[in-house]
Amino acid sequence: MTATRTGALAWLTPWRALILPFVHPEEADAISAYFTAHRFIVDHQDARLAIAACGGASTCERGTTDTRADALALMLFARRVRKTGVALHVSGCAKGCARQAATPFTLIAHAGRYDLIVDRTARDAVTNNAKRLDLAAARETLETMARNAGRRRELERQ
């Protein structure tokens, strides 16, 4: 759309980013509005930037859960926990393809339920069926952990 309407060059990066290097300033607002309306990330404060999620069941034979939808349900939590960078990795399996680095919180899917690990990678996880949480329980556990961490930081400042 943009390249056709504006005659601009458009590049798609391996990181799923679209670069429009030669947009005329007078067209920037209209282009931004178009991409916003189509649910692209156009603001560096967008809460979706605080999460990493694999394609899940709809895109991977190993995935058993709709990880992207679950990640979107948790994105505001992730942004509250960490103002910049990735705070939450939602992985469809123990491979952890969406993020290889350690993340403050990682949820690893197992048929609609999640293992929760802290400050490690999905590949570091030791599975334990007794700890598997549904999305609501995972959200509640994450919120509790974040509140407790905030209290600890407050006590350390005193």
Role assignments for model-derived ranges:
Residues M1-A111, D115:
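Small-residue-enriched alpha-helical segments and adjacent helix-cap loops
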Residues A101, T106-Q158:
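Mobile "lid/hinge" segments at catalytic clefts and subdomain interfaces of large enzymes
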